[in-house]
Swiss-Prot record:
Cell location: Cell membrane
Signal peptide start and end residues: none
Organism: Homo sapiens
TM spans (from-to): 22-42, 50-70, 90-110, 131-151, 183-203, 221-241, 262-281
Gene: HCAR1
Protein name per its UniProtKB record: Hydroxycarboxylic acid receptor 1
GO biological process annotation, one example: negative regulation of lipid catabolic process
């Protein structure tokens, strides 16, 4: 621990605003990504490179969600960290690693769609699932190398009434952490915007009556990727850039401090919104979700014999039996139907 001049702003509203935001992000993000992971693990028989990228995006988002209860507890205690030095380092590292991983794989998904739409005959489109898995492992290694410094530094700051655990220093620039924070936004932003523009432009040039529906689906998908990315990451990057531009006059400024904390919560909401990417990635994903919803809404009435004939069974039992048959039919069709590509390019 160190006793540096950490910012401690009394009477601020951060501790009141952050817990509800993080709780909402945790509940919706864990639910959405949990359902997505179940779909990948139990209803996906044929894996393709794009499937591998989307699966790792869901893994990064789900792991980030696991960290949010600890940050919620931190804010509920008025920014007092009660778990010690090592858990603080591990928590901040896990948050940064999975946030960066989510950005990387969201960018890879956009780039993968770019090659399939704009350059359908490029060699990138013929790589095997094993090669895609190797690419994923390399990307995870780079992400870990870029964030491992958070494990090597002490982030606790002891004050009179609390012990803070923050990855950002609000008194001055933060060196490598600020560099990584900016790079992991602006580089992917350039790639995603480029891919979005080229996909939309290419599809509009090739627009034909028979392809209009596919064009709309592909355009909608890439626009969802771009909107989710910009909405979740631009506010926090802008807040940090404003601080760096105005420091030292903005050091420990309550409004600047509060803006950074609140906009950082938007980056966690990226993991809550990424299920929209899965939803628009394939027509089979909405079908999977709807079938789960239908089966969960069917009432259960125990106590009926298993040997009942269909004409003697209550409607609710017939509904349950139909749900089981629907689920089995979905699983048997998943080989060919749950393709994570929106469009089939010939």
């Amino acid at each position: 621990m160190y006793n540096g001049s950490c910012c401690r702003i009394e009477g601020d509203t951060i501790s009141q605003v952050m817990p509800p935001l993080l709780i909402v992000a945790f509940v919706l993000g864990a639910l959405g990504n949990g359902v997505a992971l179940c779909g990948f693990c139990f209803h996906m028989k044929t894996w393709k490179p794009s499937t591998v990228y989307l699966f790792n995006l869901a893994v990064a988002d789900f792991l980030l969600m696991i960290c949010l209860p600890f940050r919620t507890d931190y804010y509920l205690r008025r920014r007092h960290w009660a778990f010690g030095d090592i858990p603080c380092r591990v928590g901040l590292f896990t948050l940064a690693m999975n946030r960066a991983g989510s950005i990387v794989f969201l960018t890879v998904v956009a780039a993968d769609r770019y090659f399939k739409v704009v350059h359908p005959h490029h060699a990138v489109n013929t790589i095997s699932t094993r090669v895609a898995a190797g690419i994923v492992c390399t990307l995870w290694a780079l992400v870990i190398l870029g964030t491992v410094y958070l494990l090597l530094e002490n982030h606790l700051c002891v004050q009179e009434t609390a012990v803070s655990c923050e990855s950002f220093i609000m008194e001055s620039a933060n060196g490598w952490h600020d560099i990584m924070f900016q790079l992991e936004f602006f580089m992917p932003l350039g790639i995603i915007l480029f891919c979005s523009f080229k996909i939309v432009w290419s599809l509009r040039r090739r627009q034909q009556l028979a392809r209009q529906a596919r064009m709309k689906k592909a355009t909608r998908f890439i626009m969802v990727v771009a909107i989710v990315f910009i909405t979740c990451y631009l506010p926090s990057v802008s807040a940090r850039l404003y601080f760096l531009w105005t420091v030292p006059s903005s050091a420990c400024d309550p409004s600047v401090h509060g803006a950074l904390h609140i906009t950082l919560s938007f980056t966690y909401m990226n993991s809550m919104l990424d299920p929209l990417v899965y939803y628009f990635s394939s027509p089979s994903f909405p079908k999977f979700y709807n079938k789960l919803k239908i089966c969960s809404l069917k009432p259960k009435q125990p106590g009926h014999s298993k040997t009942q004939r269909p004409e003697e069974m209550p409607i609710s039992n017939l509904g349950r039996r139909s749900c089981i048959s629907v689920a089995n039919s979905f699983q048997s069709q998943s080989d060919g139907q749950w393709d994570p590509h929106i469009v089939e390019w010939h």
